[in-house]
């Protein structure tokens, strides 16, 4: 497995421990299912449902398809909803974030990106293309500018438990450009 994903999971465990163990979790944008398998395998979640807009042949867990807009879950039906490096791939990240808020009963966990300058956005777009093109994952470049997603969560009745940025996920020399653009955040329904 990629050292990047391993570092992401280690950072999430280090900074978001109050959300674990969860009885039920939703892995939104599950990709190959690695995070879902690790969440269960490490005892961070008892049961994980994995959703994705396109299936991958190499999936490690059962992944269900969804339309990329409406999550096929009832309101407040899972204890933890998470998306790792997913929202910026969505056509409408705020609408998907609203769906995540609707479906969680307790915690919402994000690992994604934020940018301030044109150079930051260009850096994210370049890394996104390099990292995702081989999987056929579109990169619409819908990155969070500043903290708009955070504002949406907190206006939607969620209390910030932790927000970490920058996050040391990429080694030298890429980390000089990439780490300042990374964030991990955990919110709890009020």
Indicate where each model-derived feature is located.
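A conserved beta-strand element that flanks and buttresses the S-adenosyl-L-methionine
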Residues: 82
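A short, conserved alpha-helix within the catalytic core of class I
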Residues: 90-100
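Conserved beta-strand signature within the Rossmann-like core of class I S-adenosyl-L-methionine
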Residues: 106-114
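Class I SAM-dependent methyltransferase Rossmann-like catalytic core
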Residues: 1-12
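Conserved class I S-adenosyl-L-methionine
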Residues: 22-31
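Class I SAM-dependent methyltransferase SAM/SAH-binding core
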Residues: 31-70
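Short catalytic micro-motifs in class I SAM-dependent methyltransferases
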Residues: 85-86
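C-terminal alpha-helical "lid/dimerization" subdomain adjacent to the S-adenosyl-L-methionine
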Residues: 35-37, 41, 113-175
